[in-house]
């Protein structure tokens, strides 16, 4: 059976947030997945940022598994206090952690992120 476009059915629109300051600018678009995908994915995120210097973020623990598809220079990922656990990655999947991780970018990046549930990422990558 072919799927028909129904004018009565509406999908939630993406929410776009923009910020500009002396340090640079960024834009973030977020949207929920279709209802049928919500047991497997929590959110879609798109971003673009340009800042004047390298930027280091503290990513807090989560019960999700983000898939990051980066269109810019690779990110530098490392565990706090352990420089031996360091990676340079353009695109990657993270897992659930019990502590924060540090992610450094060179100042300009853009990409897409899908925040999967743990079940969703297990089904995707096995």
Segments predicted by a language model, with ranges:
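Alpha-helical bundle regulatory/interaction domains
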Residues: 2-126
């Amino acid at each position: 059976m072919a799927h028909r476009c129904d004018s009565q059915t509406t999908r939630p629109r993406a929410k776009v947030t923009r910020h500009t300051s002396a340090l640079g600018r960024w834009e973030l678009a977020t949207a929920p997945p279709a209802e049928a995908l919500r047991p497997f994915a929590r959110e879609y995120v798109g971003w673009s940022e340009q800042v004047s210097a390298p930027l280091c973020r503290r990513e807090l623990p989560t019960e999700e598994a983000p898939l990051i598809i980066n269109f810019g220079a690779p990110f530098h990922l490392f565990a706090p206090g352990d420089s031996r656990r360091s990676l340079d990655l353009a695109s990657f999947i993270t897992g659930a952690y019990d502590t924060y991780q540090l992610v450094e970018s060179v100042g300009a990046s853009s990409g897409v992120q899908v925040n999967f549930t743990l079940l969703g990422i297990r089904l995707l990558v096995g």
